[in-house]
Amino acid sequence: MISRRAMVAGTGLMALGACSSKFKTYSGPEVTRIQVFKEKRQLQLLHNATLLKAYPFELGFAPAGHKAFEGDGRTPEGSYLIDRKNPESRYHLSIGISYPNADDIAYAAKHGLSPGGDIFIHGTPNPFSNHDDWTWGCIAVTNKEMEEIYAMVNEGTLITIYP
């Protein structure tokens, strides 16, 4: 006969096994660059010229144009690097974009304003997102997609964001 303690322990282990980790592994070709097409709402992961994966996404609440100032709701345009990964993001997982660059800082300073910062590709705190543009300038994908992107993309990867 199985003791109550063994039954409870076994049930707990089965429950843990049923939970999937948000940390995935990836053993395919290296992602050498990311392309983001704001108007088409498509994020592409590439190995040299080969498309590995493409994802739809949501943007900031004012998506047209290049991010110029903190709080403008825009996503930057241009070339940047992935400069950090955040496994503790309040948006599931996130990878940081090296905005602002020197040109962004100079432009904002010329207008006496802050360029802002903390631009990320991230998941969503609400898995039932309504798919409207809702971020403050970040690029938002589903949590499942973010798990794939997080596993595939390394710090130092080039990201180019197009209008």
Please give the residue ranges for each predicted region.
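Well-ordered beta-strand positions in beta-sheet-rich domains
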Residues: 33, 54-56, 79, 118, ...
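C-terminal motif of bacterial Sec signal peptides marking the signal peptidase cleavage site
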Residues: 17-18
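Post-signal peptide N-terminal segment of mature Sec-exported envelope proteins
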Residues: 26-49
